[in-house]
């Protein structure tokens, strides 16, 4: 697992952590939205690459961003979730069964399939991220506490 490709991808992860923390954390689109550029690592990871290396590198990437931003693991969970679901979504988009899928290459995807894969992964990532970021226990149990919290 620790071959030349893994070391190269580890440098990519370190570069993405630095880019996210130094540049993209200080960019605000329309005063509210912040770009999460690090998601491109999972989207563009090679299809035939080691799946366990993808999970490990996604953990390192998410943990690095969580450590610097002090966000308590929400980026790690979100990134690991899309890294785990990536191949299942890709199989769903391409319509390949398990035997054909192992020989399938991501370079064979059409532009629409790439766009669909990218959008789905980003939406899933953001759903996990924003639900975990805004989760409050007081909103679970009573509607009075939720009303007080929302006022």
Give residue ranges: language-model regions.
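Membrane-helix interfacial "entry" motifs
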Residues: 1, 5, 50, 63, ...
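Short helix-perturbing small/polar motifs within transmembrane alpha-helices
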Residues: 78-117, 121-130
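Single conserved hydrophobic/aromatic residue that forms the stacking wall/gate
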Residues: 141-151
């Amino acid at each position: 697992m620790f071959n030349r490709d893994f070391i190269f991808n580890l440098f990519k992860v370190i570069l993405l952590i630095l880019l996210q923390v130094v540049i993209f954390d200080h960019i605000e689109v329309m005063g509210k939205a912040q770009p999460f550029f690090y998601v491109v690592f999972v989207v563009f990871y090679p299809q035939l690459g080691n799946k366990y290396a993808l999970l490990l590198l996604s953990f390192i990437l998410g943990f690095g961003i969580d450590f610097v931003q002090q966000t308590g693991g929400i980026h790690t969970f979100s990134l690991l979730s899309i890294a785990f679901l990536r191949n299942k979504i890709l199989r769903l988009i391409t319509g390949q069964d398990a035997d054909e899928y192992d020989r399938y290459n991501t370079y064979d995807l059409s532009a629409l399939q790439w766009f669909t894969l990218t959008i789905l992964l980003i939406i899933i990532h953001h759903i996990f991220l924003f639900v975990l970021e805004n989760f409050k226990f007081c909103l679970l149990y009573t509607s009075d506490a939720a009303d007080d919290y929302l006022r």
